[in-house]
Curated annotation (Swiss-Prot):
It comes from Mus musculus. The modification Phosphothreonine is found at residues 340, 370. Belongs to the chemokine-like receptor (CMKLR) family. Keywords: Cell membrane, Disulfide bond, G-protein coupled receptor, Glycoprotein, Membrane, Phosphoprotein, Receptor, Transducer, Transmembrane, Transmembrane helix. This is Chemerin-like receptor 1.
Amino acid sequence: MEYDAYNDSGIYDDEYSDGFGYFVDLEEASPWEAKVAPVFLVVIYSLVCFLGLLGNGLVIVIATFKMKKTVNTVWFVNLAVADFLFNIFLPMHITYAAMDYHWVFGKAMCKISNFLLSHNMYTSVFLLTVISFDRCISVLLPVWSQNHRSIRLAYMTCSAVWVLAFFLSSPSLVFRDTANIHGKITCFNNFSLAAPESSPHPAHSQVVSTGYSRHVAVTVTRFLCGFLIPVFIITACYLTIVFKLQRNRLAKNKKPFKIIITIIITFFLCWCPYHTLYLLELHHTAVPSSVFSLGLPLATAVAIANSCMNPILYVFMGHDFRKFKVALFSRLANALSEDTGPSSYPSHRSFTKMSSLNEKASVNEKETSTL
């Protein structure tokens, strides 16, 4: 019975969770899987951590100290900070995987680190949704947007996003726990809030049922608020933008449409496997264990990779930068700065023109220097 996994000593015997809360069945996994999975996680997490700290750190520094403060820079700085904090705590989970799922940082850090990771997921998703909605409003209501779109409102919106993410991530502070199993300490979700050494008692079935209900509530809430609803809003916003641009013939170049499609597809591909497998975990007895022992580590790695891809997708691809010769600072500055014109996308042709002017200027500088 699947309820047994929530308050039975069996869960401590054959299931371990990594830093993100999923369980890997080590008894049923093949020796090859047991060896490859930790190595795979260490490599991917390390790569994501390096790229995420570098990319998001660069965005934070340039947008904060090198640029004029605008609504766009507020969005991107908050997004970069959320991803940066996520990557700061990745080394703990790299160590966890490298030590064959042995948690050495204590119960408090088990709760705090996973709370921060969950908080980052919600913050990033909500900020991407806010950015999409902001761009949509700028296209649909350019005059209203110019009159009411302010830095103060952007800060208030970001504050609300962080508070909401805190509330939705709070279950990690309650349910995350540690247990010593066969000489190893695992960090896992103890939804029943029962001690690992507890034995069956008359109220055992009630405790188990309560634990399962909490697991369902947390998983479904995470899927709806952290994926399905944001994806629906983001998709609706960009479809509206595309429809508006095509109807008004404001963009002859199809590059903006390709960027929009790339953003939506990438976000969907990064998080869809993660949430799908977590939903399947609610009925794990009906699914082969190999699906979780191999699928969950892979899905988690793909999901966290989104934190290092955001600087690329939302900054470097944000405008029409077709020439690699353009300086990195210019790319970031142009991407994070406010768009000229009544809305973000109607001025797309000005971006192309501005890029070409920048390139011509750089060529002229070279010619002058050679003379």
